[in-house]
């Protein structure tokens, strides 16, 4: 009986630890999307004339996902601060949808610091943003995405899905 009770306690401990790992989202899925240089955005001058808080940049362009999947990337970026944290730097919030064909999407959102005179990050710069959801096989996705503007002007977006 004592051996049976010890086995039962051990089994319950393993089950509890697996439940904790499951609740913590330990699946660790990584999805990588690449694309060439970002095309010129549609620029909407919403605030004061010229670069200012409220201005928007909008894009839609193709990328490549796992297994050479064609990915459509729709991106909205809004200026939220000028000369912050230093002169010549803008704070911008981005929302983007990465569509993997059909109903599979990953959504990101977050703030990055950008050169005031540029539409995108400088080459060799990286910014991290939150994964705020998804649809299809990515339904309810959470985690973070690391977007890197590579030195050759291409881009790599690495989604770290919990």
Describe each PLM feature range.
Residues 4-5, 17-162:
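Targeting-peptide/extracellular-domain and disordered-appendage signature
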Residues 1-9:
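Bacterial N-terminal signal peptides that target proteins for export
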